[in-house]
Amino acid sequence: MDFNLNENEQTIRDTTLKLASEFNDDYWLEKDKVGGFPEDFYSKFAEDGWLGIAMPEKYGGAGLGITEASLMMQAVAESGAGMSGASALHMNIFGLKPVELFGNEEQRQRFLPPLIKGKEKACFAVTEPNTGLDTTKLKTKATPDGNGYVVNGSKIWISTAQVADKVLLLTRTTDIEDVRKPTEGLTLFYTDLDRDRIEVREIDKMGRKAVDSNMLFIDGLKVPIAVSYTHLTLPTNREV
């Protein structure tokens, strides 16, 4: 197997490394001391079109793949930005793949372009206080309510929730005792991060202060039916 980069991959790596290197060690040292999302760093990558590297062209992306996106993220981390820089960008790049793969066309047109352009930020809310990495045991519950769902529960170690406009939220819509397999009965929502219904409480850390980590306390969050999707258990013949 040939692990050498082709010309296009090398160009992506070189260009993004050069761009990220405009933000030197002093910039990241200051961010790590005082905290605060690296808005200018994020905006620069958005302006140059890199946030859509792995998204289809029809939604404003570059139409490339996960390999190219990974090379970009490696270059960002190598530049001195480390995990702070990578974590500031990764949700926009990778996080809405479920929308691309499983959302309907109206949802893709509505949700993907603002994230690709950097006009919206999102966080990914899966991990819970008492479930660790066993995602099937999560307790956050979404209950049908008229034309949508009402969500209650808690999440932990959720990055960028202090600055996010949207949240990609994994919930249980059928109790684990009532499903054939623990991977069933899970529903993924992409919706507004309504701070009247979601308390975002930052967790103090010893490092990586440029990107906040948080606990979320969700109390009666209403999600319209139009923004939900339930296709989390893929058919065995489906390739992703």
Predicted feature descriptions by range:
Residues 1-89, 97, 106-117:
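Amphipathic, small/basic residue-rich leader segments at the start of a protein or domain
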Residues 49, 72-77, 170-173, 191-195, ...:
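Short Ser/Thr-interspersed hydrophobic loop/turn segments at strand-loop and sheet-helix junctions
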Residues 118-126:
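A short, Trp-centered hydrophobic/proline-enriched beta-strand micro-motif
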Residues 134-152:
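Cytochrome P450 C-terminal beta-domain/meander region
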Residues 137, 194-221:
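Flexible, small-/acidic-enriched active-site or ligand-binding loops
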Residues 152-201:
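A short core secondary-structure module
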Residues 230-236:
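Conserved small/polar residues in nucleotide/adenosyl-binding loops
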